[in-house]
Swiss-Prot record:
Protein's organism: Granulibacter bethesdensis (strain ATCC BAA-1260 / CGDNIH1)
InterPro entries: Hfq (IPR005001), LSM_dom_sf (IPR010920), Sm (IPR047575)
Keywords: RNA-binding, Stress response
Domain of life: Bacteria
GO CC, one annotated term: cytosol
Protein function: RNA chaperone that binds small regulatory RNA (sRNAs) and mRNAs to facilitate mRNA translational regulation in response to envelope stress, environmental stress and changes in metabolite concentrations. Also binds with high specificity to tRNAs.
Name this polypeptide is given: RNA-binding protein Hfq
Subunit structure, as described in the record: Homohexamer.
Length: 93
């Protein structure tokens, strides 16, 4: 068995946009569009900051998260399927 932790693409994606402070557009299942920077997330929710205000958004209400700039999650030098990112810390705090 490999000693590396298995990482899911959702955590890798959210951690990447959080660490890089990439602006995102979050579309909710009811059609509402939210924009801001993800400052924290866990298994059930995301904190989204914009203009000094923070919103707690529950993941079950999210349809799509679209980054405001192109991102690269996968390291082309690593084997296919290796996300190559550390997701141990999910907060900027």
């Amino acid at each position: 068995m490999a000693s590396e932790k298995s990482q899911n693409v959702q955590d890798v994606f959210l951690n990447h946009v959080r660490k890089s402070k990439t602006p995102v557009t979050v579309f909710l299942v009811n059609g509402v569009k939210l924009q801001g920077i993800i400052t924290w997330f866990d298994n059930f929710s995301v904190l989204l900051r914009r203009d000094g205000h923070t919103q707690l958004v529950y993941k079950h209400a999210i349809s799509t998260v679209m980054p405001g700039a192109p991102i690269q999650l996968f390291d082309a030098t690593k084997p296919e399927g290796d996300l190559g990112r550390d997701t141990a810390a999910y907060s900027d705090e």
